[in-house]
């Protein structure tokens, strides 16, 4: 995403105000850090809502997976896109707010016992929004992101094999 490009060390600027984004990286309590956290969790909240709605809509027909996909091609496109977005959001949250797997190992932790960020897979209730979910292990976060991304690829591949592709940019 663009924020990552702007805050990297080799971002080229065409004016003399180099370093204007320096204060963004001073600490996790800085406003833009809070914005990043909220931005990705808003995406996750909305994708969870979509995933649950789509599962409820197409999951009751007793069809094989391919028959179900053929019967609901548009819904499965949305489902695949939403899963990809949720996986992307978790991967970015992990990148921005947690240690890398190498850093975790260097500090003597395993991926299973290093607590990183909360994982939400259901729609958040009012209580969840007030209190928040407990932290999940880095292993759980990476697993969630990987499962979502692999599922998205899987559904896109099936849709493509069945001849259901989107070639217009606005449909992506």
Could you say what each language-model-derived stretch is?
Residues 7:
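Transition-metal
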Residues 1-3:
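Acidic, glycine-rich segments characteristic of secretory precursors and extracytoplasmic regions
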Residues 166-168:
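Long, repeat-rich segments with strong aromatic
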Residues 13-99, 132, 136-139, 151-163:
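Conserved, well-structured interaction surfaces
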Residues 148:
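Aromatic-glycine hotspot motif
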Residues 61-68, 96-144:
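Short coil/linker segments at helix-helix boundaries
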Residues 170-172:
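Aromatic-residue-lined binding/catalytic grooves and analogous aromatic/hydrophobic interfacial grooves
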């Amino acid at each position: 995403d663009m924020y990552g490009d702007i805050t990297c060390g080799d971002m080229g600027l065409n004016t003399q105000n180099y370093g204007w984004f320096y204060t963004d990286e001073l600490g996790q309590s800085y406003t833009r850090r809070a914005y990043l956290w909220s931005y990705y969790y808003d995406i996750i909240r909305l994708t969870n809502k979509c995933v649950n709605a789509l599962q409820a809509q197409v999951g009751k027909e007793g069809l094989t997976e391919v028959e179900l996909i053929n019967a609901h091609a548009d819904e499965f496109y949305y489902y695949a896109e939403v899963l990809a977005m949720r996986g992307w959001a978790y991967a970015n949250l992990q990148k921005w707010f947690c240690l890398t797997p190498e850093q975790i190992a260097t500090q003597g932790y395993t991926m299973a016992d290093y607590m990183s960020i909360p994982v939400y897979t259901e729609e958040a209730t009012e209580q969840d929004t007030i209190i928040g979910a407990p932290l999940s292990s880095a292993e759980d976060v990476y697993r969630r992101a990987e499962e979502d991304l692999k599922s998205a690829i899987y559904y896109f591949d099936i849709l493509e094999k069945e001849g259901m592709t989107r070639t217009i940019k606005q449909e992506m």
